């Protein structure tokens, strides 16, 4: 079974990109702010929370997105060590939502020290609810994942069979299917984790696509 959440595009880019920002620190360390902006656009579109996004969430331009990123920056400011703990992300993102007049959204943190099957269950349940997942990965033994180390990205879908549980990783303007169990088993001492949104609001039906699609099609 494959389930994917809708995600906006800007000039062919799936979601925003930190590389768009002219300022050095946002360009190299703006991943936390970018994931928060993407989530806010989703909230405005599918949870009827227009206060979450200061622009028209259905017609957002690259210029709008850059302005939005600068608005988010004081709350999730890039720093030399990065936003390297989920509690930093929750505190900053929570302040942004409160200052913007958004209510009815809470957060729950899942530590990277949890076992892998807990991670699978939590991601599956969150996507089934129609909500994206903010994921922090620090170090990983697999050097092929270098671009995703010390990095925040979104999960907005899963593709599950008896053999594997793939997640759709949204970052750098594209979506890639990756094995969640492999991502989670970093074999490194410091762990990241992910942040789940909690709300009792009804997600709009077009926020979620469901159905079985063989992986790769």
Report each predicted region and the residues it spans.
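Solvent-exposed loop/turn segments at secondary-structure junctions
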Residues: 38, 139-142, 173-175
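Catalytic cysteine-centered active-site loop
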Residues: 102-114
